């Protein structure tokens, strides 16, 4: 029930991060509890729908992620989210994933009509010993992620054809959120 002017959203379990879907009433949420799910939340009526994993998920592997072994639905545990805005209601979603594998999972978001749908397109497995927290889309087709560690964490960058590289000078205590600018 609402508390004054503040409505509650029921459904997503342990939402860790949220991203709005451009030009739509939808917000995507990462629910990290137990196996974990990705949810679509309708900002108009505050209802939510599980998008991934489901029994009928779709995949269309992208050659840029050829080192990824394919989709793994169990032990998903999504954490940080970033959305690369596309055109005509199609976007790219980057998801920090824990559980069965530590990786950035990549999905195509189709928000052209009705509830958005996700198509898994690939993943970039984390370097050995790295546990990601936050992810951000970079200009071009790359992305960056924080390795949350104490006393010293760092920033990692992934680019097609090159894979992961540690960003020099990015070491700090417990890096968490991350956002990039268009330039």
Predicted regions: what they are:
Residues 41-44, 107-116:
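Short loop/turn segments immediately following beta-strands, especially the blade-tip
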Residues 14, 34, 77, 100, ...:
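Beta-rich catalytic cores
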Residues 37-87:
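Blade-loop segments of beta-propeller domains
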Residues 1-14, 62-64, 118:
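A short helix->beta-strand "capping" segment at the edge of beta-propeller domains
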Residues 7-12, 52-54, 70-73, 123-128, ...:
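Surface loop/turn motifs at the tips and blade-to-blade linkers of beta-strand repeat domains
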Residues 5-38:
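Beta-strand-rich domains and repeat architectures in extracellular enzymes and scaffolds
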Residues 21-24, 84-89, 137-140, 181-183:
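Residue-level detector of Asp-centered blade-edge/turn motifs that repeat once per structural unit
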């Amino acid at each position: 029930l609402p508390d004054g002017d503040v409505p509650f959203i029921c459904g997503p379990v342990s939402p860790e991060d949220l991203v709005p879907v451009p030009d739509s009433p939808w917000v995507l949420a990462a629910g990290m509890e137990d196996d974990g799910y990705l949810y679509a939340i309708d900002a108009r009526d505050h209802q939510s729908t599980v998008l991934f994993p489901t029994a009928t998920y779709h995949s269309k592997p992208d050659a840029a992620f050829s080192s990824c072994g394919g989709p793994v639905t169990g032990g998903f545990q999504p954490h940080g989210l970033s959305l690369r805005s596309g055109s005509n209601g199609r976007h790219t979603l980057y998801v920090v994933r824990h559980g069965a594998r530590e990786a950035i999972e990549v999905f195509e978001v189709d928000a052209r009509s009705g509830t958005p749908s996700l198509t898994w397109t690939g993943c970039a497995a984390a370097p050995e010993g790295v546990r990601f927290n936050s992810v951000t889309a970079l200009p071009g087709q790359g992305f960056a992620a924080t390795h949350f560690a104490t006393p010293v964490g760092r920033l990692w960058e992934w680019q097609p054809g090159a894979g992961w590289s540690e960003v020099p000078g990015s070491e700090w205590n417990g890096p968490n959120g991350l956002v990039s600018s268009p330039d």
